[in-house]
């Protein structure tokens, strides 16, 4: 005899019958973040490319969310992408521009659609930027095994290609039952909204579970606010930090991306006004102070300014604020050369705060700087005026180097890359935003660009991913209200190598009529790696876009590839420039354009015209220890000389 079913409670919990996918979309549309009294949607939209692994689940749910009678506040806007990796980049660009207060979701099918997410997920997690990934997955019930696009793993039946996303996600879950979505979705939101934990979050969604119906408790769909905290520093750590600063004679601040994520720019300016400590910046931190702020000494490290790097070599206290201290920042452990140098690191993530054996100050960047400013105020700390005079003079000298790099003595000549940047520098205001990630441009921008506002400089150098620029610009445009008349000019700067990696989202910009401003610098190859190749004895092998010559090398004529025509074929209005004067005119025209526009220019190569200032600090790229070619032998000698200066800070 079967047991009796339990009696229903007198007041049963209200439920709503939806598929798992419908429930997830409805849940996401009701999640909000709050910080400093500002409230916004946590997931503002969903990017997608549909295949058999998500079209009947998430795809149908998005139709319901957009057209099922929901109020406008609870609809889920849909954005159509052309490449899964690019969709993640667009979402990351959106999240960065939104100050990590709002993010976007990305849905894909199973198989190649899912694995295409991996690069974008790595970029998001490395840069501590939130994105929600919703890849389709194989059947949880396994009615047929294998299904289309399934990877078979003989030793583990529960593994799919989505498991590639585990190491690049801050949170990963596979929803094998509808009811499992409830705790998983809440954990996913927690991580996305956590300033110390955030990054890529993956919820893998088996095809059958997406379409399976369940009676969901109504509470699951209530509006929910996720408070983004600003943790204050521990009293002991704060006192230790104050003692370290007060005893320093030559302190230097290294501002990282955490300053921007915390919206701590004004607080940093107030701290430097009180202490007169100079501020160098990483790629992610550039713009923490305006370029003309008295304490701003520019970029630091391998791509930094002579001013910042010389200060770093003699600093007795390095104060990191929201930085990861990557090898580009530390010049692979050779930059901070004072034998007695100490490190103090203000970071919301304890993992980063303890790097380089630093005194940790685990706190929100703004809260930590406010506490330091207050603690030092009553103790009369300020750097020696001679030190202030020293770095101010060095900054003025570097500005002369910038002017020389930007100078255009011959307006009829083909421009160099730095002259292109100089012409753009003449044109832009604090409203403009520049986006770049890879090639030789990040180095030139870090050394030379005059940042005018906190968010003007958008260079992704955590993963330095070729192909980030165009989709990220779309995300930035969406975050800045590109469909309004008050939109900000957003420039995506790419070389030909980067353009060829990922031009597909041009079509998305055209479809959405976003006023993207794409600047293509054609130099017929991988110029950045070509230069590195020459410096390490590899003789620029395989870095030029040229026909093969008789002996099989790529030293023939340039390839007859017309990137401007390609951009036009994808829907962009294209403006070509052959000379400095041409470029000045078309850049201005592009800035005023209301639709998506491309500026195309061939640049003079470093072989024929002097380029930007050389690297002011080393970067460790190991050179062949034994070789027969003279270039490699010479490069190894230089490598051995440089590596001798490398040290571990303990």
What are the residue ranges of the model-derived segments?
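N-terminal alpha/beta PP-like core and its mobile active-site loop of ThDP/TPP-dependent enzymes
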Residues: 3-4, 9-382, 386, 423, ...
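Phosphate/pyrophosphate-binding active-site segments
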Residues: 4, 176-179, 217, 340, ...
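Conserved structured core elements
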Residues: 22, 40, 262-265, 269, ...
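Active-site diphosphate/adenylate-binding microenvironment
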Residues: 44-58, 395-485
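Conserved short loop/turn motifs at secondary-structure junctions
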Residues: 47-48, 256-260, 408, 412, ...
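Thiamine diphosphate
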Residues: 142-156, 353-354, 362, 369-370, ...
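Short, basic/glycine-rich phosphate-binding loops at helix/coil junctions
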Residues: 164-165, 215-221, 397-402, 564-567
């Amino acid at each position: 005899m079967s047991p009796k079913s339990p009696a229903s409670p007198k007041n049963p919990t209200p439920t709503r019958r939806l598929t798992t996918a419908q429930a997830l979309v409805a849940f996401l549309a009701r999640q909000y973040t709050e910080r400093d009294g500002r409230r916004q949607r946590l997931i503002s939209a969903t990017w997608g490319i549909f295949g058999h692994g998500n079209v009947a689940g998430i795809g149908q749910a998005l139709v319901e969310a957009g057209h099922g009678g929901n109020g406008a506040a609870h609809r889920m806007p849909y954005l159509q992408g052309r490449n899964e990796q690019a969709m993640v980049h667009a979402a990351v660009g959106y999240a960065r521009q939104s100050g990590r207060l709002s993010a976007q979701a990305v849905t894909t099918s199973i198989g190649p659609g899912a694995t295409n997410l991996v690069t974008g997920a790595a970029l998001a997690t490395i840069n501590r930027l939130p994105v929600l990934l919703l890849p389709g997955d194989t059947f949880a019930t396994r009615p047929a095994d294998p299904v289309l696009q399934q990877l078979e793993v003989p030793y583990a039946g529960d593994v799919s290609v989505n498991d590639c996303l585990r190491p690049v996600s801050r949170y990963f879950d596979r929803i094998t039952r509808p009811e499992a979505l409830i705790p998983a979705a809440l954990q996913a939101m927690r991580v996305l909204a956590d300033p110390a934990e955030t990054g890529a979050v993956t919820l893998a969604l088996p095809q059958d579970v997406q379409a399976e119906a369940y009676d969901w408790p109504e509470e699951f769909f209530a509006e929910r606010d996720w408070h983004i905290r600003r943790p204050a520093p521990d009293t002991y750590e704060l006192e230790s930090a104050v003692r370290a600063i007060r005893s320093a004679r030559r302190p230097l601040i290294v501002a990282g991306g955490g300053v921007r994520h915390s919206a701590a720019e004004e607080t940093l300016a107030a701290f430097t006004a009180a202490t007169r400590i100079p501020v160098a910046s990483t790629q992610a931190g550039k713009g923490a102070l305006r370029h003309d702020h008295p304490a701003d000494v520019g970029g630091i490290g391998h791509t930094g300014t002579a001013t910042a790097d010389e200060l770093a070599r003699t600093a007795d206290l390095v104060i990191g604020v929201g930085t990861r201290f990557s090898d580009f920042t530390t010049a692979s452990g050779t930059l901070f050369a004072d034998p007695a140098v100490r490190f103090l690191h203000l970071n919301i993530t304890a993992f980063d705060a303890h790097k380089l054996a630093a005194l940790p100050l685990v706190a929100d960047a703004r809260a930590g700087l406010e506490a330091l400013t207050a603690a030092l105020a009553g103790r009369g700390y300020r750097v020696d005026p001679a030190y202030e005079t020293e770095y101010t003079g060095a900054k003025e000298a570097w500005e002369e180097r910038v002017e020389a790099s930007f100078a255009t003595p011959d307006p009829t000549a083909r421009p160099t890359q730095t002259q292109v940047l100089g012409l753009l520098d003449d044109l832009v205001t604090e409203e403009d935003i520049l986006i770049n990630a890879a090639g030789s441009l990040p180095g030139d921008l870090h050394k030379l660009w005059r940042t005018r506002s906190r968010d003007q400089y958008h260079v992704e150098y955590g993963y330095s991913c070729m192909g980030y620029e165009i989709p990220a610009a779309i995300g930035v445009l969406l975050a800045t209200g590109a469909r309004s008349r008050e939109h900000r000019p957003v420039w995506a700067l790419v070389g030909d190598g980067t353009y060829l990696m990922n031009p597909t989202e041009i079509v998305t910009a055209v479809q959405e009529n976003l006023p993207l401003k794409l600047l293509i610098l054609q130099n017929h190859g991988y110029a950045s790696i070509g230069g590195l190749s020459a410096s390490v004895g590899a003789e620029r092998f395989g870095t030029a876009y040229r026909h093969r010559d008789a002996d099989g090398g790529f030293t023939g004529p340039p390839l007859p590839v017309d990137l401007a025509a390609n951009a036009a074929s994808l829907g962009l209005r294209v403006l070509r420039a052959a000379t400095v004067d041409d470029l000045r005119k078309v850049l201005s025209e592009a800035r005023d354009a209301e639709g998506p526009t491309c500026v195309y220019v061939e640049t003079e190569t470093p072989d024929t015209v002097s380029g930007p200032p050389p690297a002011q600090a080393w970067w460790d790229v190991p050179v062949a220890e034994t070789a027969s070619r003279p270039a490699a032998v010479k490069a190894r000698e230089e490598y051995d000389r440089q590596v001798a200066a490398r040290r571990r800070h303990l």
